[in-house]
Every structure is written in C-alpha cells, then in structure tokens.
Amino acid sequence: HSMAHKLGAFHHLPHGVANALMLEEVLRFNSAEAPVKMGTFPQYDHPKTLSRYAEVADSLGLAGTTDEEKLESLIAAVNALKARVGIKPTIRDYGIDEADFLARLDDMTEQAFDDQCTGANPRYPLMSEIKQMYLNAYYGGRHFEEPPMPTAADFEPAADPHDFKRTYRKAGK
C-alpha cells in the first residue's frame, strides 16, 4: 500500500491502479521462505504470509498441492482479474516515461519506505527491495527474488551517521 501511495502521487495514477500494478511483486516479496520482520506483533511470532496466501487460494478453489504452487495460482488469478477489468500489465504501459520514472525512483522509494503503512506490512522491506519491486513492476517480466545476504563489502560509512537508511549500498550499483 505504501508503494502504491507514492506511485500514484509521483506519476498521477489512480490509487487502485497503483495497488494493482504493485500487487504481484508484493505478494512475492511477502511470501519469502525466511521472512524477516523488524517489529513484533502479538498475533504472530513471524510472518506466515505464504501459508495465508495458500489459504486464500484454497478458498478460491485454485490449483496447487504445495503452498508455493497455490501462491502461483493465486498470482495467476489476480493477474487474470486485472486483465478482465482493464488493468494494464506494467507501469510503463500507462505511458510513464522511462527517464522520468528512473529520475524519480530514488525519491519515490525513500518516501514509500517512510510511509505510515510500511510498518504494517507483514515483512519489513529494505529500500533496495522497494526499489527493485518498482523496477520489476515498471518493466514487467521480472519478479522479486531474494537478494544474497549482504557482506561487509556492501556497506560504506554514511556521511551523516544518523542517516541509517542510506548506509547500505549494494556493491556494483
């Protein structure tokens, strides 16, 4: 939801369309095998989104024997529904200029990270993960995949030691 807030604000897309454009990436991100949550909530010891998404697929009568297969069936059903109601497959398909999208991407990513809804997500994203989901939703055809765990070489000192959000820099980018 946080990402849709900013996608709509930066690129003048209706909020429902922005949510629909981000949904597949967010479903994949939230259903990670080894999810991490930086906050604690009494209703769960860790996010159980993959099994919850599988329950949704079961309720809809979708195919699959494993939770992963059910997730893929759920995503296929969501994408089919989006197509039936006229939601285009990618952000780019809405006429958002690539240069403009890329020029605003870092600000949009940071604002999505800081959005009040981010803390309520079952899995707390890194800014680099938000950025990758935006890119995937813009270009289409790629999906969120767990990045390798960072090593010491992936970090550099921040100019401002209080600016912890900008300390992590992916090596080679």
Describe the residue ranges of each PLM region.
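Short, amphipathic C-terminal "tail helix"
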Residues: 100-173
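Gly/Pro-rich interdomain helix-loop hinge
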Residues: 10, 17-100, 143-144, 149-152, ...
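Short alpha-helical scaffolding segments that buttress acidic/His motifs in well-ordered protein cores
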Residues: 3, 23-27, 78, 82, ...
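Glycine-rich phosphate/pyrophosphate-binding beta-alpha loops
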Residues: 2-19, 114-120
